[in-house]
Amino acid sequence: MRRIAAFAAVVLLAGSAVPASAKVVAYEGARLIVGDGRVIENATLVVDGAKIAQAGAAGEVRVPAGAARVNLSGKTLMPMIIDTHTHLSSKREDLLRDLRARAYFGVSAALSLGLDGFALLDVRKQALPGAARFFSAGRGITMPEPGRTTAPFWVTSAAEGRKAVDEDAAHKVDIVKIWVDTRDGKYQKLSPEIYGAIIDEAHKRGLRVIAHLFDLEDAKGLVRARIDAFAHGVRDKDIDDEFVALWKAHPNLVLTPNLPDRGVKVDLGWLRPGLSPEEFAKLEKANVDNPKAQAFYGIQARNLARLNATGARIVLGTDGNKPWGPHDEMQDMVVAGMTPAQVIVAATRNGAEFLRIADAGTLQAGKSGDFIVLDANPLDDISNTRRISQVILRGASVDRSKPLF
């Protein structure tokens, strides 16, 4: 449904009261999209320091005496976005810039998949002011790909695959990334024997495995081998009944669709305040209709729609380093057939659960004070996620006063 009924009587409390102090702020009068499918009209959200203390309908939330009160009538609040497939910079200064840029566009956490190495994994432990949280697959695993990056482990046997997993595990990566793709016939791809060994070893080590893939037949083999997540949907053809049945038999399997560019010219005006004139001009130059891209998008859009109809667990990912990319991806997911409400759940609660971030993904008591203040309702039009009035990260306003690039 494009509009979810409001839960006017719902109140989510962390204890019976919140002590009043200068750090307590009550945001009042906005529509609150919880992130789990519920909506509260005319809500009150009380933030104490970096945490949400209360969230519920106006009149049902007890605002502590002395709390600062912010009138957000006419606005919509939604949780900050979780991007489960990025490729962030490998230099520390650039990585920190990437994480700040994501917060600017309303992203609270990003998973970088397999091209990072191990040198910057310490950044994951840092709560950087005004910056998204960092998650990483460290070094991914693939067959040798001469001419491409050497950041992943190159393996040619099951034993080498297991050894690569062991090294990832020793560095405590968040997930193991594998590539199963010939890159248009240029390379050999991981065989079922090798990726099966990788998945088995990872599971022994308490790690999950996410796969880059292209072909339907590889997707079937990966599901049978107990893969945990797909970093893309099937891209070579429409999925069939056998694949749908396999997916249904593995209800914990997670899909990050990473839809490609739709190949149609779009309005980029919303990006202008965040970019220098030079960077904006580069985007505009590339903003053209592309019939080939339209056909490629069509295959993946149909496959996403079919899996979504089965109740598949879907999260959001962008497969790149564009900090505004999640807003484009959400639009593409709706064009593919998901409702705005479904897309928001995928981009918030589902993403947080996939990355195992216990205090993110929904606007509920006890969660981190991470939310986007929007000028319009994204349940009516998903592109309204771009109409950002303010971003609050861990209870503090993110500086959006100047261009990022």
Tell me what each language-model feature is.
Residues A347-R349, E353, S368-F405:
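C-terminal cap of metal-dependent C-N hydrolases
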Residues V223-F230, A249-V254, G311, M338-T339:
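Glycine-enriched alpha-helix->loop->beta-strand junction motifs that scaffold or abut catalytic
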Residues A6-S16:
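Bacterial N-terminal signal peptides
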Residues R92-D94, K189, A219-R226, D261-P277, ...:
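Histidine/acidic-residue-rich catalytic or RNA/ligand-binding cores of hydrolases
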Residues K204, P291-N377:
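His/Asp/Glu-enriched, well-ordered alpha-helical/loop segment
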Residues L72, T76-T84, D94-V209, E242-L283:
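Divalent-metal coordination cores built from histidine and acidic residues
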Residues L32, D36-M78:
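Histidine-rich, glycine-flanked metal-binding segment
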